[in-house]
C-alpha cells in the first residue's frame, strides 16, 4: 500500500485501485496467485463484496457491503473484465502454472499482466489504457503519457515516503527532546500558505505563542514530510531569518518560526496609569507617531484634542500629558500664537490671552501721557502770562467792507482798505490772532457739546458752543451780541484800562447780516484758521495803555507757536478725559471763586 503511494501515478486510475484491492487482506474475492504474477478472482464473492450496491443486505457479502468507499462505478462483472482487457490483462487457462483452487463454489478467473506483479508497484507506470489512439501511438513507437497525480495525490505520496525513510535536514536537529513522531495536534494559526510551485510541500508553517491552547488534530497532513532542501517561504524570508521552534520539538517535524520584521505592525492596547509625555518639536511628533509597537494609551486622557500646532509651541513643562489644558502662564505663551481651547473643541484656532498677560506700553499710550503733560505745562505757563480779558469793541464811524472774494482768509489781515481807521484796527488785532487758534486747537476739538464744566479764572474766559449750522437770523445774532455787550460792560467796570482786541468768528458760512448798530462788516467764514464747525473765542490781552500793541504782537505769536508745536506732537484720543483730569487736579480756580 505504502509502496503504491510512492509511485507517481494517479490513485484514481484503474491500475492503482486494482493494486490496493489485491494487497488488502479485507477482501477474499481477489488475491495473488502462487507466483505473485497474476490475479485470482472469485466471481460470485467478488460481486458480493465489491460490485453490489452499498447497503446492509446488498449481495449477502461476508465482508459487509458498503464498508469500503465505492471503487467501481459499475455493478457488472462483465464491465470489470472489460477494464482488465483494456489495460492489457490476459486470461490464463485453469490448471496452468500458478493456478489455484477457488475459495468459493463459483468459477475462478485467472488474469496475467507482465507489469502487474507482487512487490513491484513501480511497474504500474507502464500500464496504459489501450484505446484506439493509444494503440496507434504504441504501434508507431510513441510514448503514451499517463495522467499525473494532482496536488493531494502528491501530498499523499510525500507522506508515504516520509513514513518509510528517516528525515534528512540540512538544518541541525533540536538540541533536546525525543524522536519526532509523525502524528500530533497542531496549534491554530500555524499553517501559512506558500505559493512556491517548485516546492514539494504546499504548506509552510508559522508557529504561534506557546500559550495558545486551541488546537485541532492534524488528519490529512499527518504524514507530510519537510523537504530535504530549504525553501523560501511566501514572505520572502531566507534561511537565516527562520529558527526552529521549541514548541514543536516533540510534535513531529520542526516547524520554521518567522522572526519579527522592523516593519511589522503590532498593536498592544492595554490600560496603563503611566502618562505619555509629548515632547516639543515636529520631528519628535512624526517619529513617535510611526512607532506602533506596544503603544500604551494614557488612562488620564481627556476628551480634548490638541492639534500638532499647539504641541509644537507649548513646552513640556506646561503640559500635563494630554490630560488638561496648557497652564496659562506668561512664560509658556511667549512664542504661542494660537491655542485650541479644550472646552470649546472648535476646529479653528482661537487666540488665548491669560488674565495676567503683561500689558506692553504702546505708542498711543505714550502719546496720551505726553499730551497730558503738555497740557499742564501750557496751563502753568499761561498762568504767568499777562491777564486776558474780554473787552468791548469800540465803535468806529467808518465801515470796513470786505469783499467776498477773500473767503477763507483772515478778515482783518486781508483788508486792503487804505482807511486810517481800518489800518489801525488791523494793526491792533493782527498780532494776537494766532493765540485764539492755537488754544482752540488743543483745548476744544469736538463737534459735540462738552459735558465737563470748565473752570473760569480772571485770566481766561471761554465761550463754547455746539457746532450747528447758523441760518440767516438777525434776531438770534442781535441777541447774542447784546449779551456779549453786557459782559463787556461788566469787565470794563473792573478794568477801565484800554486793551487790545482779538475777534475770532465761528460757525459755517452765513450771509451778510448786521452785527451791531455801530459796526457793519460784510464777512465770510475763516477756513484757513479753524474749521467751520468748531468753537470760537473772544480773547483780549490786558496791558498798559502806554505800551504799543505792535510790541506785544511781536512777542506773543512766537511764544504761542512754541506752545502749539509742543501740543501737536501727539493728539489725545479723548479730549474730554484731558479736561476732566485738569478739573480734578484743580489746576484752575473754581467757578465760585471767579464770581467772587
UniProtKB/Swiss-Prot annotation:
It is found in: Nucleus; Chromosome. It comes from the Eukaryota. The modification Phosphoserine is found at residue 572. One of its GO terms (molecular function) is DNA-binding transcription repressor activity. Residues 10-200 bind DNA. Residues 541-576 are annotated as: Disordered. GO terms for cellular component: nucleus; XY body. The keyword Magnesium does not apply. Transmembrane segments: none annotated. Its main location: nucleus. SUPFAM superfamilies: Winged helix' DNA-binding domain. Pfam families: HSF_DNA-bind. Gene3D superfamilies: Winged helix-like DNA-binding domain superfamily/Winged helix DNA-binding domain. GO terms for biological process: cell differentiation; male meiotic nuclear division; spermatogenesis. Belongs to the HSF family. DNA-binding transcription factor that is essential for male fertility, spermatogenesis and meiotic prophase progression in spermatocytes under non-stress conditions. Positvely and negatively regulates gene expression to ensure progression of meiotic prophase beyond pachytene stage in spermatocytes. Plays a role in male germline meiotic sex chromosome remodeling and silencing through regulation of SMARCA4. Homooligomer. This is Heat shock factor protein 5.
